[in-house]
């Protein structure tokens, strides 16, 4: 039986560069610094998913007390030995829409302005108001998509705002 949601992972071509960006631009905190995993354990875990020799370089970042609770973190992953391919030119991440990471802030307009000043590329023109949320979409330098949300009722989960 499932008991919680542990993490969301995004893949990047350079973990160290991505960690610096997520710290400097989004203000995330490094919980587990970049480390290269290339032992028998990772081979048993992912050996059927990625080409040999299996290697994963990863870091874990969070917001607030994420490091205390251990879950609800962002895992940043690089597969240093797997051949990469460019993201689609049309911007779609999949044939079925946008896979994305949801982030919550307390002042969407101010947070968007701060991120724009840091050079973040937004995918939407402004801020939308939907079902009790204010939202805007952006991407990181590796074209991972994020939705930034401000909740009308901060004490409730994002999906219970209406």
What name fits each language-model region?
Residues 10, 33, 60, 74, ...:
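Vicinal oxygen chelate
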Residues 3-7, 96-100:
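Short, solvent-exposed beta-strand edge segments and adjacent coil->beta transition regions
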Residues 11-70, 117, 137:
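Core segments of cupin and vicinal oxygen chelate
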Residues 39-45, 84, 124, 128:
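A cross-kingdom feature marking solvent-exposed beta-strand/loop segments within repeated
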């Amino acid at each position: 039986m499932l008991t919680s949601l542990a993490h969301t992972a995004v893949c990047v071509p350079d973990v160290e560069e991505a960690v610096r960006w997520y710290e400097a631009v989004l203000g995330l905190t490094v919980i587990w610094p970049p480390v290269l995993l290339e032992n028998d354990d990772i081979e048993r875990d992912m050996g059927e998913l990625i080409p040999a020799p299996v290697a994963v370089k990863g870091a874990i970042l969070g917001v607030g007390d994420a490091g205390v609770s251990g879950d609800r973190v962002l895992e940043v992953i690089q597969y240093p030995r797997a051949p990469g391919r460019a993201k689609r030119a049309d911007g779609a991440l999949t044939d079925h829409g946008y896979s994305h990471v949801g982030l919550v802030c307390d002042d969407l307009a101010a947070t968007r302005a701060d991120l724009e000043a840091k050079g973040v590329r937004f995918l939407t023109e402004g801020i939308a108001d939907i079902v009790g949320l204010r939202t805007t979409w952006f991407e990181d330098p590796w074209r991972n998509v994020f939705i930034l949300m401000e909740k009308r009722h901060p004490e409730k989960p994002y999906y219970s705002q209406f």
